[in-house]
């Protein structure tokens, strides 16, 4: 009987170990405790703006010549982008009118787009620079929020919403909740996961082990929305603190031991672990 109980206890312990392993994943020097959700990045334009045609064509050329692949390796260590490729995409467009192109970017979405001192950087920023160089356009930047992308586009403040942007046509609904198809969107070009991350050398391996601790997240509404979607998890923490600087600031604080966990982007995790 004692032997049977001992075997049962051993099996239970093994089951718990496998359960813990299933709910967390070690990536480099970090551990992903839980994935809170996934999203897809897109580029948005005013509906009918010819800029969308030129930018899409330039992106196809940059995918064909390896520029996008090189940028993906630089920022993420791997290329999971899904841009269409066509080396001749610009040939059929004839002469391209010269212009200043204003990029509306989210400066809280490292490493897609972020403020680095007085300049902007990131995968999307460098890709936009490559696009404008190919088109002969002058590129300017304007910080916007993901939530206000449609307003910024329709008002003419920006020519595109590009830089860690998660967009769909519901973002252009009017006050009566009726769709107003006033945005032209590219196909999704990169998937991102919102993840609950701890240091790999910490004692935290499950959401349960984080009870009463402090979790940091960026000021963009995306992060709080992902955390709040799991009400039980949100209440689990002693404090949920927002910090400016997005995932970059969160990873720096986590590495410095200023918090137990962070809510951050899988693209940022890829940046810090490749």
Model region roles, listed by residue range:
Residues 1-10:
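Bacterial N-terminal signal peptides that target proteins for export
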Residues 19-22:
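C-terminal motif of bacterial Sec signal peptides marking the signal peptidase cleavage site
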Residues 35-81, 125-134, 200-222, 268-270:
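Extended ligand-binding regions for polar small-molecule ligands
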Residues 40, 78, 174-176, 241:
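A residue-level marker of the well-folded mature domains of exported/periplasmic proteins
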Residues 105-111, 117-133, 165-166, 191-251, ...:
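Bilobed "Venus flytrap"/periplasmic-binding protein-like clamshell domains
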Residues 157, 214, 258:
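Conserved functional loop/turn residues at catalytic and ligand-binding sites
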